[in-house]
From Swiss-Prot:
Gene Ontology MF annotations: translation release factor activity, codon specific
PTM annotation (N5-methylglutamine): residues: Q231
Designated name of the protein: Peptide chain release factor 1
Keywords: Cytoplasm, Methylation, Protein biosynthesis
Keyword check for Cell inner membrane: no
Source taxonomy: Bacteria, Pseudomonadati, Pseudomonadota, Alphaproteobacteria, Sphingomonadales
Length: 355
């Protein structure tokens, strides 16, 4: 994709303008915050745009040198090398210029729920949580559990955690969907392979200004927290259930002994789910953009299979199979899958632009 020279100049001028504003020392408050965001977003684009412009100018200079018999051989060699490298650099620029998802730099709410497969599904949900926890550690992110429903055999029936850091949602958003595991359970004496599943949802966490919640739209119920088998785990009414009446979204929280802490956590989850609901509505109005994404974005879509006997992980959306199951489930190896999904998404969006 060839970017016009006028567009390169526009990028350079806009970046120079932002640099001057940032250096002026006159920006304060929200104006400074917005300018900083604009600068951080434009900087990588401006860097690649400058490289493309320099390569094009160098091609022009080398073409003039072809008229000089003494310089012709050297100029031809350098010209061939730059002409070969330029299309890839222009592709990098086109990717850098793709419209950004406004949520990409937001923290995320990670929700993992055991699906079909009983105890084995709960154990797998635990494996997935630890995989994301270790991957997050490698990225320098922070993971804080918000609520959990542990299984009696280990793992989780459900766990919700907050993941914060740089570029969290951008890297984790393609993890939403049904993850399937094929392995022999430890309790299986006959050595038969069982298939079970867990559902992962990754939701961007909104800023306060992104979602406004009116108290009159909420129905709040307070009740006594209960544990496995229905026994009460607290002698006071500390569990909280919040229903958002306009959307019907219901959030329950009972992990903390304090009603106030449970309410605060429930509101955090509600705000995130409401923001996700609003994003889905707007994406529904932008069907073409959504169609260009990797996969359907539907959280009921089976996206990945982890086959333990064969030591392989297959991502069904991009047809990628990696025989690195141990490395992936341990956390560090997940980066290769994440990178492949991001690259495929960029390629699809580039193709959609050129149609």
């Amino acid at each position: 994709m060839t970017i016009p020279a006028t567009r390169l100049d526009q990028i350079a001028n806009r970046f120079a303008e932002l640099e001057a504003r940032m250096a002026s020392g006159t920006l304060e408050g929200e104006e400074f915050v917005q300018a900083s965001r604009d600068y951080a977003e434009l900087e990588p684009v401006a860097k690649v745009a400058a490289e493309v412009k320099a390569m094009r100018e160098e091609i022009g200079g080398l073409e003039e040198m072809l008229a000089d018999p003494e310089m012709k051989a050297m100029a031809q060699e350098e010209l061939a090398a730059i002409r070969e490298a330029l299309p890839e650099k222009e592709r990098q620029l086109a990717i850098a210029m793709l419209p950004k998802d406004s949520a990409d730099n937001k923290p995320a709410m990670l929700e993992i729920r055991a699906g079909t497969g009983g105890d084995e599904a709960a154990l797998f949900a635990g494996d997935l949580y630890r995989m994301y926890e270790r991957f997050a550690g490698e990225q320098g992110w922070k993971v804080e559990p918000v609520s959990m429903n542990a299984s009696e055999v280990g793992g989780f029936k459900e766990i919700v955690a907050n993941v914060s850091g740089t570029g969290v949602f951008a890297k984790l958003k393609f993890e939403s969907g049904v993850h399937r595991v094929q392995r022999v359970p430890e309790t299986e004496s006959g050595g038969r392979i069982h298939t079970s599943a867990a559902t992962v949802a990754v939701l961007p966490e909104p800023d306060e200004v992104d979602v406004q919640i009116d108290d009159k739209d909420l129905k709040i119920d307070i009740y006594r927290a209960s544990g496995a088998g229905g026994q009460h785990v607290n002698t006071t009414d500390s569990a909280v259930r919040i229903t958002h009446l306009p959307t019907g979204i219901v959030v329950q929280q009972q992990d903390e002994r304090s009603q106030h802490k449970n309410k605060a956590k429930a509101m955090q989850v509600l705000r995130t789910r409401l923001y996700d609901h609003l994003r889905e509505q707007s994406q529904g109005e932008e069907a073409a953009a959504r169609k260009a994404m990797v996969g359907s974005g539907d959280r009921s879509e089976r996206i990945r299979t982890y086959n333990f006997p064969q030591g392989r992980v297959t991502d069904h959306r991009i047809g990628l199979t990696l025989h690195k199951l141990d490395e992936i489930i341990a956390g560090p190896g997940l980066g290769e899958l994440v990178g492949a999904l991001i690259a495929e998404d960029e390629a699809k969006r580039l193709a959609a632009l050129s149609e």
